[in-house]
């Protein structure tokens, strides 16, 4: 029987009524307090998530705002209304970001590779390098095949063939004799072994052609010259070999190894500072590039199917092919890995440069995706130099597009030639804006297509090249993640014989029962076991 409620308590809140199973009922005040506590806890979790991913959100917002601002300024008159001086001032914040990123590329690449190569055993270094190059080669071949298949299926150049004469006449520029395939590979080998390390920091070797008159006949003559741009391939090779040499020195090389490691750590601190300026720079980089275009609508209307083919291929390769390869080998969620590198991907879209994205990519794969420093700082600089999945796919689409444009059929031999040449030439593509277009002429020459049609590709390269850069840096990151998984499995296999030997020496029956009194090392946790949430994970590196 329930007692009468006391005075001042007409609803009987002071009385505790038993429930059906005899347990006392929960106090409503305690319920409200628990609800408030859960609400505060969820707010804290949301706040921690926002704080941890603030740079990602700011970068994505900057990209969207840059597109909106560029379209708004273009609608108000664009570059003609601004004038040359105001256009330069409008693009200045983005130019400043590019200069800051390029400033730290040289010390970051050299120091990270020297330290990474010196920290690895030469045999392990060879295995890691071989696996990395194999992964990059296979993914580039897959990207090339995907590009050719999409271009043959969607026929982007067939509908555009009727408009070819008018657009080619308005957009064509004077063409210099194009580079031969053999000379391109020889230039690649020359750049691997630079004659001067100081000049390799800002120049690279290239072969150009001049037409000279010999007895009334015009002959293409190769001429060697140094072109502006860092010879990053030569610096990468030198840094790796130099790091191996320091390891061979033993104790005598330790001070120099510590110097390069400290230099690299200080450079990463600079990277973390620069990244907070990145959203501002990306906003104006994207906006200024859209403003510089004469008529974005006309370009999309005339070359829309070609753009769609390139972007669709990049989306399939970046969202399906690369994640599927990562999942098949690691059995881990690839899209969680992608979320960890979302900021570098947005940076790649804004800067359109694999090399400029390298510092932030190193920071994110180490801190957010758990890749060891010696792996990321060894694999990522190599990937930024030789892994160009996006460029290979775009070059294959462009080659098939130009063939359809000129009503030239592609037989099986020519398709294989496009695949092989695109895969090989993408290795030599510079990690700079429009680097893939520079090597497209090699593919066109290999299948006897007119190089003059590159002017059409250049008209929309400002958009396609940004998509290429995203795929390039994503492939580098997945390569580092796969190598980290390979190293982890190798270490586990190396420790298994020791564990088996220890277990066989002690019979199971002689072990004490794992209770609290007999084993003081056991401690019961009050909370439930499980992984921490993705937003609560922090780096311990």
Curated annotation (Swiss-Prot):
BP GO terms, sorted: glutamine transport; L-aspartate import across plasma membrane; protein homotrimerization
Main location: membrane
Statement: the UniProt record of this protein carries the keyword Membrane: yes
Name of the molecule in the record: Neutral amino acid transporter B(0)
Modified residues (N-acetylmethionine): 1
Residue sites binding Na(+) 2 per the record: 385
Gene encoding the protein: SLC1A5
Residues passing through the membrane, by range: 53-82, 96-117, 132-154, 226-249, 259-286, 308-329, 375-401, 462-483
Subunit structure: Homotrimer.
Domain of life, per lineage: Eukaryota
Entry keywords, A to Z: Acetylation, Amino-acid transport, Antiport, Cell membrane, Glycoprotein, Membrane, Metal-binding, Phosphoprotein, Sodium, Symport, Transmembrane, Transmembrane helix, Transport
């Amino acid at each position: 029987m329930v007692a009468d409620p006391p005075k001042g308590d007409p609803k009987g809140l002071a009385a505790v009524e038993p429930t059906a199973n005899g347990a006392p009922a929960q106090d409503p005040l305690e319920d409200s307090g628990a609800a408030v506590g859960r609400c505060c806890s969820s707010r804290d979790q949301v706040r921690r998530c926002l704080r941890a991913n603030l740079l990602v959100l700011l970068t994505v917002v900057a990209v969207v705002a840059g597109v909106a601002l560029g379209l708004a300024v273009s609608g108000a008159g664009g570059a003609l209304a601004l004038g040359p001086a105001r256009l330069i001032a409008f693009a200045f914040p983005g130019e400043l970001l590019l200069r800051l990123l390029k400033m730290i590329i040289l010390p970051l690449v050299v120091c990270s590779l020297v330290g990474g190569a010196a920290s690895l055993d030469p045999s392990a270094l060879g295995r890691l390098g071989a696996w990395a190059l194999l992964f990059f080669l296979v993914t580039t071949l897959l990207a090339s095949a995907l590009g050719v298949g999409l271009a043959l299926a969607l026929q982007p150049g067939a509908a555009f063939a009727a408009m070819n004469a008018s657009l080619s006449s308005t957009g064509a520029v004077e063409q210099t004799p194009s580079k031969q395939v053999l000379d391109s590979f020889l230039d690649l080998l020359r750049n691997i072994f630079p004659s001067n390390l100081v000049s390799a920091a800002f120049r690279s070797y290239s072969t150009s052609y001049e037409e000279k008159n010999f007895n009334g006949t015009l002959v293409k003559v190769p001429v060697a010259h140094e072109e502006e741009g860092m010879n990053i391939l030569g610096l990468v090779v030198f840094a790796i070999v130099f790091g191996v040499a320091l390891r061979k020195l033993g104790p005598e090389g330790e001070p120099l190894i510590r110097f390069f490691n400290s230099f690299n750590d200080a450079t990463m601190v600079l990277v973390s500072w620069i990244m907070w300026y990145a959203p501002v720079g990306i906003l104006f980089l994207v906006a200024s590039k859209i403003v510089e275009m004469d008529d974005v609508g006309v370009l999309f209307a005339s070359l829309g199917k070609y753009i769609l083919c390139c972007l669709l291929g990049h989306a399939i390769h970046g969202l399906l092919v690369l994640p599927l390869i990562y999942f098949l080998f690691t059995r881990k969620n690839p899209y969680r890995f992608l979320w960890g590198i979302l900021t570098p991907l947005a940076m790649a879209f804004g800067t359109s440069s694999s090399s400029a994205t390298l510092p932030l990519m190193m920071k994110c794969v180490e801190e957010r995706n758990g890749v060891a420093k010696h792996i990321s700082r060894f694999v990522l600089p190599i990937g930024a130099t030789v892994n160009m999945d996006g460029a290979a796919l775009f070059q294959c689409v462009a080659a098939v597009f130009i063939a359809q444009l000129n009503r030239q059929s592609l037989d099986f031999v020519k398709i294989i030639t496009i695949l092989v040449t695109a895969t090989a030439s993408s290795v030599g593509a510079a990690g700079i804006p429009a680097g893939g277009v520079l090597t497209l002429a090699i593919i066109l020459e290999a299948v006897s297509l007119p190089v003059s049609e590159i002017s059409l590709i250049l008209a929309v390269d400002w958009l396609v090249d940004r998509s290429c850069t995203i795929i390039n840096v994503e492939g580098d990151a997945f390569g580092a993640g796969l190598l980290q998984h390979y190293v982890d499995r190798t270490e586990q296999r190396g420790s298994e014989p020791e564990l088996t030997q220890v277990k066989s020496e002690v019979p199971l029956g002689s072990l004490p029962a794992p209770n609290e009194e007999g084993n003081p090392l056991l401690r019961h946790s009050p909370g439930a076991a499980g992984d921490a949430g993705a937003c609560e994970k922090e780096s311990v590196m």
